[in-house]
């Protein structure tokens, strides 16, 4: 009588034969980008800060004005000390009697961050409405410069020849042009007329600054896009498109432009931070947004008069600029790492 003995190898083969083959799900490009971005805690935090900034500027500002019962340009006589004429500090209350209302009226006005200067305007509301101005200048100027830069970079990088030469020389001219002197001259010659251009929905001065930043800022994205297109124009998919008879315009629009989405997104966030900082600097010097329209820069311009005693007038607008520019820069760094295929998942 023979006895059948199953060896370990035989048992293993029998078990394995009943196991379903494991399927590996391929991850798409944007899914990989999201996974890399999600694992960067600093980038996620920066994105949250940027979202909060937009919410505070465009939803929080009108809501706060409604709840407080006054606007950013409302002047309060009791917003300044009647003896020293210095602005009141944070969390100051102005009673109904001081507002000229019936003293028995229950209502009173709260200045959360104090007043902004000798006019006694609400610093908190002016910072919120100043965020609208800074973000509008940053976003619109970045949109204009990126659109113009992408067009110029595509033309120069793909067509080459005399077009590349002309655009490259134009980039060099714009890079070295003293745009600050141009802004000063423009402010003197046509300042009031340009500041009144609002397009029906922008604060005064925003369109002018956005236009100037576009004209003198497109060279940066143009140089980046030109370099990317130069590295792509000899790839196989471009050669295949040429062999099928696709026109240059179709190749640039349908084959090259989709590959520029990643650098466009990354560098747009960095350019927004640069434009916000430039607007604040010009407004501080009196060359940007004019009073009474609130801007972080022109809020800081009044701070030197009170920096020894009312230091909050310097601290709060300065913190707003610091947090905003840092958030956009860190977000740009995180997006750059997320779009980099060499980054680990």
State what each model feature region is.
Residues 1-146, 150, 154-155, 162, ...:
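Gly/Trp-centered helix-boundary motif
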Residues 119-345:
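Alpha-helical transmembrane segments of integral membrane proteins
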């Amino acid at each position: 009588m023979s006895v059948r003995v199953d060896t370990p190898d035989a048992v293993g083969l029998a078990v394995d034969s009943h196991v379903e083959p494991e399927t590996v799900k391929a991850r798409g490009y944007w899914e990989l980008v999201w996974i890399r971005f999600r694992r960067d805690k600093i980038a996620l935090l920066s994105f949250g800060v940027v979202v909060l900034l937009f919410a505070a500027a465009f939803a929080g500002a009108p809501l706060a004005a409604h709840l407080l019962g006054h606007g950013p340009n409302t002047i309060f006589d009791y917003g300044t000390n009647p003896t020293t004429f210095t602005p009141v500090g944070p969390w100051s209350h102005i009673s109904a009697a001081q507002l000229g209302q019936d003293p028995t009226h229950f209502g009173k006005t709260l200045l959360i961050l104090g007043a902004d200067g000798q006019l006694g305007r609400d610093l908190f509301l002016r910072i919120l409405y100043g965020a609208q101005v800074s973000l509008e200048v940053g976003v619109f100027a970045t949109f204009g410069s990126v659109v113009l830069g992408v067009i110029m970079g595509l033309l120069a990088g793909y067509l080459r020849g005399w077009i590349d030469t002309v655009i490259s020389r134009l980039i060099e001219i714009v890079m070295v042009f003293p745009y600050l002197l141009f802004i000063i001259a423009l402010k003197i010659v046509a300042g009031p007329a340009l500041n009144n251009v609002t397009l029906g929905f922008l604060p005064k001065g925003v369109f002018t600054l956005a236009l100037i930043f576009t004209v003198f800022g497109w060279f940066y994205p143009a140089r980046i896009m030109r370099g990317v297109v130069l590295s792509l124009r000899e790839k196989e998919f471009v050669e295949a498109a040429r062999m099928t008879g696709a026109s240059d315009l179709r190749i640039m629009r349908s084959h090259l432009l989709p590959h520029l989405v990643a650098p466009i997104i990354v560098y747009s966030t960095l350019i927004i931070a640069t434009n916000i900082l430039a607007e604040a600097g010009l407004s501080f010097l009196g060359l940007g947004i004019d009073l009474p329209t609130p801007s972080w820069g022109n809020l800081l311009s009044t701070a030197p008069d009170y920096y020894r005693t009312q230091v909050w007038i310097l601290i709060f607008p300065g913190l707003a600029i610091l947090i905003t520019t840092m958030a956009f820069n860190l977000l740009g760094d995180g997006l750059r790492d997320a779009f980099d295929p060499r980054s680990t998942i």
